[in-house]
């Protein structure tokens, strides 16, 4: 028997050829993304978030480089003017800027080093050491986070006055040498990042408790220490109420000194915002220098989660 083989007409599709992807699906992937590749919408939202976050600082710099009359214009200015250094000179003439800057740097650095050091020690103890009452003590630490800071200002001020510390830098530093949030944050990080087997192995090799903490816990906790350090420095740098209560007007921090630029009858907002821009620059420099550690810590936390 002979078989008759037919040929498909020209222009007809073969049975095994895959159908082309729909154009609608391709457009959806470009907009919303697919898998690990973000889409246009993701980039658009990130850009909008970036602009909304950077605009207040940019607007402060614009008004700080102009006169006070710029606030009354119908359309707010978007480009800097030429009065920035004039306003900066007014800031230097009105407040003890360099003294306030030195106080803020000193206070923020001492508080940051103390909080990071004590929090890492306490967090490691709560996470990896077994001792009686550990869970109860940790519960007390967490419970203090629910108490508003303003509730303890009056009793704390009375203690500082009894000790004779009012007007001194120590009155600002001592109450914040360690924080409940720092202890809780480091404990939650170290409880997952350091395996118990690694600590037992170090003990079997003859390492002491201090040596284990130094060579095992600290290297593993560096990303979290960087994040806690940045957060603590920023909190100490921007603190206003407590330094205002315990420090004299002649020995201020940068935030309390900026409040001296305002008077009861007239406020030159261009001078105030010029001072605010100067006070923000150290934080921006810190974030630029420590940005790599910050991103590393966030990424490690995301991978563990």
Which residues fall in each region the model found?
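Short, Lys/Arg-rich, polar N-terminal cytosolic tail immediately upstream
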Residues: 2-34
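A structural signal for multi-pass alpha-helical bundles of membrane permease subunits
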Residues: 38-305
């Amino acid at each position: 028997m002979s078989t008759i083989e037919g040929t498909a007409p020209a222009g007809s599709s073969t049975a095994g050829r895959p159908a082309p992807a729909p154009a609608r699906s391709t457009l959806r992937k470009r907009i919303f993304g697919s898998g690990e590749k973000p889409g246009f919408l993701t980039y658009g939202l990130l850009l909008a978030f970036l602009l909304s976050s950077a605009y207040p600082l940019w607007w402060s710099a614009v008004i700080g480089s102009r006169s006070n009359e710029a606030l009354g214009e119908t359309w707010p200015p978007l480009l800097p003017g030429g009065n920035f250094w004039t306003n900066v000179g007014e800031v230097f003439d009105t407040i003890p800027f360099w003294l306030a800057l030195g106080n803020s740097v000193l206070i923020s650095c001492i508080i940051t080093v103390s909080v990071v050091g004590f929090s890492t020690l306490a967090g490691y103890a709560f996470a990896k050491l077994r001792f009686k009452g550990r869970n109860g003590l940790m519960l007390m630490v967490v419970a203090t986070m629910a108490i508003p800071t303003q509730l303890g200002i009056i009793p704390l001020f009375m203690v500082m006055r009894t000790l004779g510390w009012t007007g001194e830098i120590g009155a600002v530093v001592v109450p914040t040498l360690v924080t409940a949030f720092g202890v809780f944050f480091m404990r939650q990080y170290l409880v997952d990042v350091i395996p118990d087997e690694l600590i037992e192995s170090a003990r079997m090799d003859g390492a002491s408790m201090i040596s284990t903490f130094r060579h095992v816990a600290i290297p593993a906790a560096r990303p979290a220490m960087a994040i806690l350090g940045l957060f603590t420095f920023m909190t100490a740098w921007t603190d206003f109420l407590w330094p205002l209560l315990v420090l004299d007007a002649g020995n201020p921090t940068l935030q309390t000194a900026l409040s001296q630029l305002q008077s009861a009858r007239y406020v030159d907002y261009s001078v105030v915002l010029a001072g605010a821009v100067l006070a923000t620059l150290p934080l921006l420099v810190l974030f630029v220098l420590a940005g790599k550690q910050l991103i590393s810590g966030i990424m490690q936390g995301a991978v563990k989660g």
